[in-house]
Amino acid sequence: MNIGLFTDTYFPQLSGVATSIKTLKDALEEQGHNVFIFTTTDPHIKKGTIEPNVFRFSSIPFVSFTDRRIAFRGFFEATKVAKEVKLDIVHTQTEFALGTIGKYVAHQLKIPAIHTYHTMYEDYLHYVLNGHLL
């Protein structure tokens, strides 16, 4: 199976999400699947660096957590890449930009999309706006 993992967080960023995705990728590849990571650019990765089966999309720092990134384009490029690698399924790992792009790709290619919900946002509320909602 050709599997596309869509995430706003991937190595070299260090997080539980990035580690979870790498673990999933490795396990799926051990079972004979082809796994493709669709993720954000990272300032620690030189432009033009070749990362097998990793596709990076233009991104900027996320507003509240500047060590995290959010893609600001990539719908058409991701769809083109997904067609080229003949994705069978999309697995989104974020509710943000790359998650939306992944859902768009699945819809365009008429393939299934599944989602993993990693973050309990209510547990992070105290980090954003000192715990106050707008």
Region locations from a protein language model:
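N-terminal subdomain of nucleotide-sugar transferases
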Residues: M1-S58, A82-K83
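An amphipathic, basic-hydrophobic alpha-helix
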Residues: V63-I89, L98-Y104, Q108
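Histidine-centered beta-alpha loop that forms part of the nucleotide-sugar donor binding/catalytic region
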Residues: D8, Y117-M120
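Short, hinge-like loop/turn segments at secondary-structure boundaries
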Residues: P52-F57, Q108-K110, G131-L134
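Short glycine/serine/threonine/alanine-rich loop segments
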Residues: H33, L87, I111
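Nucleotide-sugar donor phosphate/pyrophosphate-binding loop at the beta->alpha transition
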Residues: P112-I114, E122-L134
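Short His-centered aromatic/hydrophobic patch
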Residues: Q93-L98, Y117
